[in-house]
């Protein structure tokens, strides 16, 4: 059993697993998996790791089996878990943007709105939330739990509609389905057990995890640029430079040149560097960022 000065951390199995482990590594924690082992190693003597399904994570955190963990907002709502939501961490297996739970029907079906499904059968893994959604809208439907391959249920005639999660909508369309409504936007959240959150050691450890994870996410898509600029060229260079904050500028020793350092989005670099060079910047260096705190 982990002691009072040990944080019990839950890592989600399945679709979020690889992205989560990669994010932790970028944040400074290396999680080492072993074949068929639910308790991976982590390079922090104050943390123990457990693997569990994202669908179950919030229940384990609420009960205190885990002090904290990462799971989707959708599963916290589905389980109606009473936990502390420490932070939103917007990342997923495909992209760094929220996923959507959508209501979808066959592309050639007559259903256009949720109201059109009154009295119909809906298949989903997110049963509790779906029942609450339709009940709140005053639309009587039959909600059936789906064990997987939910998109195929409509095609096979086993359901009139599905409620399924998607990031891009590509898989939904590939199965001959049409989205008629977005029901929920969801993203990964860092959650904590309420008692653990009141413990000074555990709360501080969770806050450090959050700070570093957020910093790693914030750094994605950003790069640093460093360059030397003649003093007389600085006004033109400054007019061109975007930055998270004002550029850092320092005098070079015994020269009428300045060292300039900025952080920019990676997508603009291929156009920005030639313009900087044309304006007189030299020794331009681009470097990757691991974290932006």
Curated annotation (Swiss-Prot):
One of its GO terms (molecular function) is ATP binding. Its cofactor is Mg(2+). Feedback inhibited by histidine. Pathway: Amino-acid biosynthesis; L-histidine biosynthesis; L-histidine from 5-phospho-alpha-D-ribose 1-diphosphate: step 1/9. The keyword ATP-binding applies. It holds the Pfam family HisG_C. The keyword Protein biosynthesis does not apply. It catalyses: 1-(5-phospho-beta-D-ribosyl)-ATP + diphosphate = 5-phospho-alpha-D-ribose 1-diphosphate + ATP. It is found in: Cytoplasm. Belongs to the ATP phosphoribosyltransferase family. Long subfamily. This is ATP phosphoribosyltransferase. It comes from Solidesulfovibrio magneticus (strain ATCC 700980 / DSM 13731 / RS-1). The lineage of its organism: Bacteria, Pseudomonadati, Thermodesulfobacteriota, Desulfovibrionia, Desulfovibrionales. The gene is hisG.
